Amino acid sequence: MENTLKTLYNNKICKDLQKKFRYKNIHQIPKLVKITINRGLGEAANNKQVLEKSMNEIAAITGQKPKITKSKKAIAGFKIRENIAIGLVVTLRRDKMYDFLNKLINLALPRIRDFRGISYKTFDGRGNYNLGLKEQIIFPEIKYDNVDKIRGLDITIVTTAKNDEEGLTLLKEFGMPFM
């Protein structure tokens, strides 16, 4: 089954970007490289159930088992010891990346309360976009009754764009609802 966003990129977006930015070579056209989903769980140091529930939530959202990130050094102020699980990360590529982006644009973002669009100011200067979500219940796979605590997650969309303008145009073409 061909992915709709991937087909859209190959058939329409490439041509539009090539016209707009006047690329001489098709390899200059920006494309998506990967999407990284990250969740920091400081409270997981004390409560292992938090880590398990978050792993299940992120696996349901992304369709891929998350990798546990561990602390590199002890920080007394945060009550964290070295080598303790404090977060989860998933890197999506190829078809899963396009599936997740489609779900994010068409299902999750419109479910945010008082949603008017996402900010275009969180590009990093190299065409990569960062998005922070405050609650995981906007995804259709997460049932509100099964959630013990509202936790957010960070999403990074990595592109081959040379600058923010190219990255913004690429994501707008995919249908990202910028304000």
From Swiss-Prot:
One of its GO terms (biological process) is translation. It is found in: Plastid, Chloroplast. GO terms for molecular function: rRNA binding; structural constituent of ribosome. Keywords: Chloroplast, Plastid, Ribonucleoprotein, Ribosomal protein, RNA-binding, rRNA-binding. InterPro entries: Ribosomal_uL5, Ribosomal_uL5_bac-type, Ribosomal_uL5_C, Ribosomal_uL5_dom_sf, Ribosomal_uL5_N. Its main location: plastid. One of its GO terms (cellular component) is ribosome. Pfam families: Ribosomal_L5, Ribosomal_L5_C. Part of the 50S ribosomal subunit; contacts the 5S rRNA. HAMAP family: Ribosomal_uL5_B (MF_01333_B). Binds 5S rRNA, forms part of the central protuberance of the 50S subunit. Belongs to the universal ribosomal protein uL5 family. This is Large ribosomal subunit protein uL5c. The lineage of its organism: Eukaryota, Rhodophyta, Florideophyceae, Rhodymeniophycidae, Gracilariales.
